[in-house]
């Protein structure tokens, strides 16, 4: 009996040891991490002995960080750069193998309930300055898509200079969109035209021009400029100046979708039906300014609103492609209301019987959580150069209705 237990323990240890390595790729003496982070194109890690650590909880101290990373090998140095919301740091090893082992085993490890990001550290000069490059937005990314995957997809265009997936700082998961930079404007436009609606991973991606400043992925952070910068596939920590945490796309208090370019005949009921059919989440309120051609749809959560923006942007409503972005004001805590009841299915002006039947089928599938399968046909994804995905909506709207936070 004891011998069986000992054999079982040895098997479990062997399985744990195997999990440290990329399956079927490298033997233990050649351990190499899976490069899923945001490294410069052509980055060579063969001589690296330092790792970047991002998304560090504010309660983590430098001695604790040193203790955690010493588990994979002796350290030459350890530096923690403190920030109010999340810190970052750099760990230097005496040998490359220990650094590689740290990336494989410690990336995603929770410290005080917050997953840390670990990847190779590199000099700022190794990354090309993309501040004057042409940036495109790539939405509806599947969870498995990394910076490396995104760059590989767009690198068929020779002027592609950088690619970054936006990650949730608290969960460590992809937020479902990213940005790609190009040196040549025409190639950026070609990428939008050619790859919009194409499959990447398990989803069809949506491509459009990024809002001005949103895709400035090449900007450097002053704290890390002279040493190393972000390499973990996020735009937080070492890139805090690139992604503003108060911006609507990063602030969980923003739950309202601005909907522009509405046809004059669109009513609040029509708008409700349109967004309910997307199946993005629970709708709490719908408002419309018919004389100005725009409206607002408030969801119960930030994630649902983001999903609605991705699914709804450029979809046709009464023959016009609507423009979806974030509302300009956050929803104050405690102001959420009960979900709106599902809209009644009735005859929709401007639609043929065939269109209405298709809408009803789409609505039924949305209720079964199948709305993700509904993507507008390629020809209906209308996006003009310069059209931003997140442009903040409009404020200062006079209304006699109860206050809704746009």
Swiss-Prot record:
Presence of keyword GTP-binding: no
The encoding gene: UBP1
Keyword line: mRNA processing, Nucleus, Repeat, RNA-binding
Function in brief: Heterogeneous nuclear ribonucleoprotein (hnRNP)-like protein that acts as a component of the pre-mRNA processing machinery. Functions to facilitate the nuclear maturation of plant pre-mRNAs. Binds with high affinity to RNA molecules that contain AU-rich regions. May bind to the 3'-UTR and protects the mRNA against exonucleolytic degradation. Associates with nuclear poly(A)+ RNA in nucleus in vivo. Does not stimulate transcription or the 3' end cleavage/polyadenylation reaction.
GO CC terms in record: cytosol; nucleus
PROSITE patterns: RRM (PS50102)
Name of the protein in question: Oligouridylate-binding protein 1
Intracellular or extracellular location(s): Nucleus
InterPro entries hit by this protein: Nucleotide-bd_a/b_plait_sf, RBD_domain_sf, RBM42_RBP45_47-like, RRM_dom, RRM_dom_euk
Region (Disordered): 231-250
Chain ranges of the RRM domain: 49-123, 134-212, 255-329
Molecular function as annotated in GO: mRNA binding
GO biological process: mRNA processing
Organism: Nicotiana plumbaginifolia
